[in-house]
């Protein structure tokens, strides 16, 4: 029925102790290469911010389709490189993977049903959430 549902579209989700993040941490410690996609443009979210956003949707009885990613875009390679620099204060070893000759966009950006400003993180906010310092 109309008005009784919420569809949440998610980008790549990171968490301070999420498997994806811990896999990157392990690769850094073992000096193993990390696959990155330089021509893939993404937006991201963190597990903490996602839970805040869902909490808001439930408490305010919102309905409709929501895109819960960062408000800005970054290349996958730049995001992973910055994440590693912030978490480990060093650069990693990267295996750059090109899946096509053109830029690919894997992003969930809202056109309608926007959340309040304090629940719309940028990718730098997500990087701050994942920092170990």
Please place each PLM-identified region on the residue numbering.
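Pocket-edge positions in alpha/beta enzyme catalytic cores
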Residues: 39-42, 71, 118
